[in-house]
Amino acid sequence: MASRKQGAREGLWSMGVRLLTTLLCITSLILLLKAKQTVRRALGLGYIAQTVKYSDTSGFIYLVYINILVAAYGLIVFVSLIPSALGKSCSGKCSRWTIFVLDQVFAYVLLSAVSAATEVLYLADKGMSKTQWEALCPTYGFFCHMVSASVAIGSVAVVLLAVLSVSSAQSLFHNFYTRALYTTKMRHSSLT
C-alpha cells in the first residue's frame, strides 16, 4: 500500500512537471510569435520602415516548431498519465520505455532549438565586426527583449525536460529491473 501511494505521488509529481514544461513551451512560443518590431529610419529626405520578426531567421523558426512539438508531446503524455495517477490503471513496461526514450529525444531536440536561437540572439545583440554585421538590439530593443524572454523560458523547459528524463529513467529501471538485479545478486552470493 505504501509503495502504491509513493507511486501515485511520483506520478502526480511527474504530471505536474510535464504540465509546467508544456506551459513553458507554450509561453516561449507565444513570446516568439509576438516578437516583431517596426522602426522608421531616416533615408535621405524621407523615412523607410524596417520590420524585424522571428520568421526572418531559421533559428527562431526552428524554435517555434520545436516548442509546438514539445508542448504537444507534453500534453499527450500528461493526458495519458491521468488514469495511472488516479489509480485506475498501471502503465506497463512498454509505455514507460516509450516515455523514457521520447523524454530523452525531446530534451535534446529542444536543447538544440534553444541553442540555435541563442546563437542568433547573440549575433543580434553583439553583431559581428569581422563581417560588418551590425548589432540589431540597440535599434530593435522590444524584439530582442521578447526573443530573450522566449529563449530564457525555453532554457528552463530544457532543464525540466532533463529532470523528467532522469525521473522517467529512475521510474523505469527502479520498478522493472530492481527485482531482477536483486535475484541475480542473490544467485551470485549463494555461489560463493
Swiss-Prot record:
Keywords: Cell membrane, Membrane, Transmembrane, Transmembrane helix
Assembly behavior: Homodimer and heterodimers.
Ranges annotated as spanning the membrane: 12-32, 59-79, 97-117, 146-166
Family to which this protein belongs: Belongs to the Casparian strip membrane proteins (CASP) family.
GO cellular component: plasma membrane
Phosphoprotein found in the keyword field: no
Cytoplasmic side: 1-11, 80-96, 167-192
Predominant location category: membrane
Descriptive protein name: CASP-like protein 2U1
Subcellular location: Cell membrane
Positions in the Extracellular compartment: 33-58, 118-145
Entries under PANTHER family matching the protein: CASP-LIKE PROTEIN 2C1-RELATED, CASP-LIKE PROTEIN 4A4
Record keyword Membrane present: yes
InterPro entries: CASP/CASPL (IPR006459), CASP_dom (IPR006702)
Topology in the lipid bilayer: Multi-pass membrane protein
NCBIfam families the record matches: A_tha_TIGR01569 (TIGR01569)
